[in-house]
Amino acid sequence: MANGVIPPPGGASPLPQVRVPLEEPPLSPDVEEEDDDLGKTLAVSRFGDLISKPPAWDPEKPSRSYSERDFEFHRHTSHHTHHPLSARLPPPHKLRRLPPTSGRHTRRKRKKEKTSVPPSEGTPPIQEEGGAGVDEEEEEEEEEEGESEAEPVEPPPSGSPPKAKFSIGSDEDDSPGLPGRAAVTKPLPSVGPRTDKSPQHSGSFPSPRARASRLAGEKSRPWSPSASYDLRERLCPGSALGNPGGPEQQVPTDEAEAQMLGSADLDDMKSHRLEDNPGVRRHLVKKPSRTQGGRGSPSGLAPILRRKKKKKKLDRRPHEVFVELNELMLDRSQEPHWRETARWIKFEEDVEEETERWGKPHVASLSFRSLLELRRTIAHGAALLDLEQTTLPGIAHLVVETMIVSDQIRPEDRASVLRTLLLKHSHPNDDKDSGFFPRNPSSSSMNSVLGNHHPTPSHGPDGAVPTMADDLGEPAPLWPHDPDAKEKPLHMPGGDSHRGKSLKLLEKIPEDAEATVVLVGCVPFLEQPAAAFVRLNEAVLLESVLEVPVPVRFLFVMLGPSHTSTDYHELGRSIATLMSDKLFHEAAYQADDRQDLLSAISEFLDGSIVIPPSEVEGRDLLRSVAAFQRELLRKRREREQTKVEMTTRGGYTAPGKELSLELGGSEATPEDDPLLRTGSIFGGLVRDVRRRYPYYPSDLRDALHSQCVAAVLFIYFAALSPAITFGGLLGEKTEGLMGVSELIVSTAVLGVLFSLLGAQPLLVVGFSGPLLVFEEAFFKFCRAQDLEYLTGRVWVGLWLVVFVLALVAAEGSFLVRYISPFTQEIFAFLISLIFIYETFYKLYKVFTEHPLLPFYPPEGALEGSLEAGLEPNGSALPPTEGPRGPRNQPNTALLSLILMLGTFFIAFFLRKFRNSRFLGGKARRIIGDFGIPISILVMVLVDYSITDTYTQKLTVPTGLSVTSPDKRSWFIPPLGSARPFPPWMMVAAAVPALLVLILIFMETQITALIVSQKARRLLKGSGFHLDLLLIGSLGGLCGLFGLPWLTAATVRSVTHVNALTVMRTAIAPGDKPQIQEVREQRVTGVLIASLVGLSIVMGAVLRRIPLAVLFGIFLYMGVTSLSGIQLSQRLLLILMPAKHHPEQPYVTKVKTWRMHLFTCIQLGCIALLWVVKSTAASLAFPFLLLLTVPLRHCLLPRLFQDRELQALDSEDAEPNFDEDGQDEYNELHMPV
């Protein structure tokens, strides 16, 4: 049998057998006196006196009635089959009594002094695990003495009657035992389950006198060697109870004692003696070193040691959190069930009652009273930490038993509370996922749930918590007024329950997250609130409980009557918000007892904000709350940092603090700063090569992804549009010496070479506004000095290579750290003003050449002029193929104005649409990113549809040819083409080379600095020295071939990095997006540059683009560049009252007049640069721009304090990847 006892014929239950004691040799008087005292104290007669008076019957409390079904269940239940007490007796070699010695006599006296209950006060308790106060070492010494000084037992005289002794819990004698199992005789009458207060128990047992005579008769049987035994010998290790076929079975006591106790007491004894309930605080009892499993031989300890080795180490490492609040509600059929009403990943999301959909994530606002009630609830409720259960019924069973032990609920409410905890769970997404056919989860009655799912106790996998269907009788009604409660569906963990899970929500939950389930509700059968906080030993997947399959680690249960003042909903929100707080849930993982949880609540209250109970009208009144909260969080982090430093001081790390160190407690290893000087010539360049080139194979492998293909198509249009725009304007500025063809070829060649050799291949090289301004200034200078413009650029390029080599050799890239936003804003604001001015100046020239006249030339004259210089649809021929375009054309000015404004407004509207709330985030982002190509395409179609109005078109040659073949070729002679180039200019070209180096250095290095921000999570590093050397050296080659100089384009480079950025999907709703990785590779840059170069074959298409459309793009770039500059925002504050100023650091931390003074200084620098740019000395404007750097670091600290400069000139811009956030123009202080 499973119980290890051979049943007699007929299937009767075994009856314990008792042997007749043998006659013992006379002992000393002291020993006999002690034996007599203990015999009187623990005699059977005292038990008879205790049970002779039955407890009074209370007629008000209902008693349970038992039927034949109850008795049959009791007879055939395995855990009610009791073993004979003789089976717990020690082996035969322990039957010998030791003679008294002086040492033993002294130890007996010492043990008698430790006895807490005198014999006259009552019956001593039966110890759970070893006798209280018994010293382990003394017992081992007694064993050794007993084996060395044992005397043979003499048989009693034949004529003397046997002396019956029956003492329980003897502290003196070693317990005798039997060499084998007791023989089975007749079955013991079974006792049905009953409660302590049932009046039926009085007739179930014989009288004390009859019981005593029966026991005496049993003890007089000849096969009993001794009647003196010790209850301590019945102790066995808890791990030995898990073996179904082992000698140690789950039997709480023997039949004799079972007849004295009720079924409730037997169940309690069984739970107390045989189960190990984690989280339940018990009195510490010193365990004796002797156990029955290891008494006979060392092999008995092997199973115990094996199980100890298999015990897993507690996982105290905090995980990410997912909290779900379930409230007890009634459905449409008035059936109770658990309904999900809120959830937390980081912020709170509530279910809207009317629409049954999730609301927007928000910061949870809690009432101060609910937090105090929660603290009081945890202080007085049940706290089960490190509970070793893996099923919901097992957890619920131990929670209910703990509530009963802590006097939170009555024993008769056990069934109702357990049924309530096991009710089915429903979620808002259940009906949505199932469509027209709602999902019907598997349900079962209480009997099937408890019969099929036995929670596993901590002492062994095979030992199950005793569950018995009839222990609860017929299923008690969950609600007292509901007679059909037994048919209500309960939670069935094993069913198919996750059909309605939300995959989108599951993506937002981190992979290693562990869930917290909060169950709160009102029940009518409780008289007072009952609560329990449970932390499982390890996270387990409780199916059908959560909306998504996330393992559960914490549970909080709160049930109570409705007539109390407790708001269960707010209390559930409070504990859920606490568990979603980072510091509190870390403390919950590391808590050792209840006090740690209470301390964590106090820490949470220290960082909380209390808002007065007044009506708040408008968000402006709550502006101070956010700032105050940031201050509290800062102080909280400082306290945590101080604690971490104290725990790590001296090399000691407190237990449970390893994660805090990983999260920022310990300093990270210093990173390889690419701008750090080595002190050697070309030292920075060598470090860049060693840092970046080892990643070259991965730069090719990482491009094998579909995201790279999408990035290539997007950045191609983003790079082609500026190339066409700046190429057309450059042709206007240089009179056709350089145009679209040269700029496209330069972008393609330099882009491919830089992508293959550069240290940061994510940079996009291209033409920019500052270089356009410089080219125009240098062209005017050469015309004024009667010099060849292209030949002068050759010498400027050669000097540029020399200066770049000298700068890289001296590791001068570190100077970029001194270029603050003060200089960047001046630079960007100046270029934006130039763009806007040039746009309207070009439009003014169109109105001058084609004025609005009341009378135009005759039709024939107009046709003759059109035939002389126009292609069909009014496309202007290249300068070599005919005269300049016609003048005084009707409607040309108006159409040019419409095309320019139409292009600007379409591109600007699509940019605003990108940050709007229409459509999805990805769709808006795609439309917004392609705003410029879309606007160009739309307005080209508009111009193409109007055939009778002339507009000036973009000049693009046919095939791979220069813009003006009659003026130049692809190679520029360094000594001059038409006439010799003056030698003095060969040397003087060093000055413009130095100026163009300033522009290239500032744009390239600032762009590389922006791309290399830590927030962008680039892992392969960058190389400022190598990138500058490549761009400068390639600039020298551009001069020889008559190609425009290029630099790292800020907006296009940042857009390229953003297109290759992979965002984390496991982001809590309402939280800002986080970068998972960036696909750093070289292939996309090569493909983008190649596609731009191949665009030269689209000459027929490019010749259809009107110049007015390019003016609109020029205007768009100028206006959008101003939106991200703090200078433009502070400029508007001059015209705004102080009460309407925004809550920005440069407003709140600086006085208004001093803020305006800083703005005026910047405007003065811009005005000076504009004046220089407008005069003949326009070539020197990069040098004046460079002078703003020493102005910021030398003069401004004398006018402003450090804290003011920190607020006015701080680089606090971070990359924004929110779908509803700002674009690249708002993040950057650099010109387009």
UniProtKB/Swiss-Prot annotation:
Signal peptide: none annotated. The chain crosses the membrane at residues 709-731, 737-774, 794-816, 826-847, 893-910, 926-946, 980-1002, 1028-1049, 1083-1128, 1155-1191. Residues 58-75, 267-279, 481-499 have a biased composition (Basic and acidic residues). Residues 1-316, 429-499 are annotated as: Disordered. Its main location: membrane. Residues 1-708, 911-925 are cytoplasmic. The keyword Mitochondrion does not apply. GO terms for biological process: pH reduction; regulation of cardiac muscle cell action potential; regulation of intracellular pH. It is found in: Cell membrane. It catalyses: hydrogencarbonate(in) + chloride(out) = hydrogencarbonate(out) + chloride(in). The modification Phosphoserine is found at residues 167, 170, 175, 198. The keyword Cell membrane applies. InterPro entries: Anion_exchange, Anion_exchange_3, Anion_exchange_CS, Band3_cytoplasmic_dom, HCO3_transpt-like_TM_dom, HCO3_transpt_euk, PTrfase/Anion_transptr. Residues 76-97, 104-113, 280-289, 305-316 have a biased composition (Basic residues). It is a multi-pass membrane protein. Belongs to the anion exchanger (TC 2.A.31) family. NCBIfam families: ae (TIGR00834). Sodium-independent anion exchanger which mediates the electroneutral exchange of chloride for bicarbonate ions across the cell membrane. May be involved in the regulation of intracellular pH, and the modulation of cardiac action potential. This is Anion exchange protein 3. It comes from Plecturocebus moloch.
